[in-house]
Amino acid sequence: MFQMKEYQIHLELDRSQQHNFLYPLLFREYIYALAHDHGLNRSTIPLENGGYDNKSSSLSVKRLISRTYQRIHLSIYAKDSNPNQFIGHNNQFYSQMISEGFSVIVEIPFSLRLVAFLEGKEKEMAKSHNFQSIHSIFPFFENNFSHLHYVLDVLIPYPIRPEILVRTFRYWVKDASSLHLLRFFLHEYFNWNSLITPKKSNSIFSTSKPRFFLFLYNSHVYEYESIFFFLRNQSSHLRSTSSGLLFERISFYGKVEDLVQVFVNDFQDNLWLFKHPIMHYVRYQGKSVLASKDMPLLMNKWKYYLVNLWQWHFHVWSQPGRIHINHLYKDYIYFLGYLSRGRLNTLVVRSQMLENAFLIDNAMKQFETTVPIIPLIGSLTTARFCNSLGHPISKPTWADSSDSYIIDRFMRICRNLSHYHSGSSKKKSLYRIKYILRVSCVKSLVRKHKSTVRVFLKRLGSEFLEEFFTEEEHVLSLIFPRAVFPSRRLYRGRVWYFDIICINDLVNHDKFEIFPN
């Protein structure tokens, strides 16, 4: 209790404008306890690793704090200190602990500013409760993208250089000691092989990535978007509500105005060349979409400015293939696990005036979303549910489990896929994925009982695993009474759910990797 009160005292320092408080928190045990409690709901390494009990975990934290303090103190005087001996030895357990603890520390000033900002936005946040679902993005696409023509499909570039991250963090935190410590940690990270998550997990957003890297990446993306929104507002002379999130930036507008001046001087282009009020920007994780109604000249201008922004301000080389200019009614956009594009539907109307009859073709614009079958089969192949050709195979790792457990696991995967891809315009691809999982479930049970598929299905009957194909209809029947929707048209149509807050695990993420400076 005393430690939590002490923690509250440290948080109150922000109100008195004392910013030099982050560094001492590194040597407080309760910081690592908070990191441990936060990690219980994540796939991070807990403090009790390798058979440690709570008592030995506390001793491990004390030992880590002692070694950290001694090593930092000695590194001030020793010029040729070995970075691999920062905590005594290369130990992934200790490195994960210090990573999680430091991530809690650097998040404190951001959390305080965010809470203060949201206190004045409670009414607006209550109105936008449904928009917390990532499925709410697609109704936004349907309402706003159907009358647009061109889309910039952007993958935010990487790698992130350590010094760029320190510079970004300096805009937010005025604690010099913490900045030096952050720089020290970053260079240590790039020298410690044990601190970098194995390359088998390529996505920065995977649950196996340390919280520290997620925080640094989000800080980098937010810095990029802050400048991007500033350029967007300057070009259209409109103020975006997103600019309200710029808390206490150090001479932010002056810095960005200098950046704009550099753009004008170095590239001999003016911002008025891409002025247009109809422009929409959407981002999820490392993928963003920029849509406009104008001709390709505008999109080429934005591509040109984004590439130069990344190269000259963030010192990141953007590969040409990371930005694509797509025609909304000719090319597909891969976003949030869906293939989306505009579609023109022709409606023929027969009209008659006096004795003359004629047909009128009316073109109606719609936004179409479909399930990408090839990436999903690739994910199922990686998860060992099928081979590279899409042929179902058994799941040998579940062979020791009970029949009910195996069926429940497969049913849960099918249920989540149906729930996530319920907004697909065409269900045929989704039915194929369900078929793969259904046969994989049968083969897993057959492998366990050392039988054949024919004998196994004959013994259980034809109703076995029918719920693989009827689960979505069952859920919709609970939401919409059949008396209101007597036909099956509802089940074939698109349904967006507002309770989905994260992307499905089987949807491929964009690859992300951090390289040393």
Curated annotation (Swiss-Prot):
It is found in: Plastid, Chloroplast. Pfam families: Intron_maturas2, MatK_N. The keyword Ribosomal protein does not apply. One of its GO terms (biological process) is RNA splicing. Keywords: Chloroplast, mRNA processing, Plastid, RNA-binding, tRNA processing. Its main location: plastid. It comes from the Eukaryota. GO terms for molecular function: RNA binding. Belongs to the intron maturase 2 family. MatK subfamily. Usually encoded in the trnK tRNA gene intron. Probably assists in splicing its own and other chloroplast group II introns. This is Maturase K.
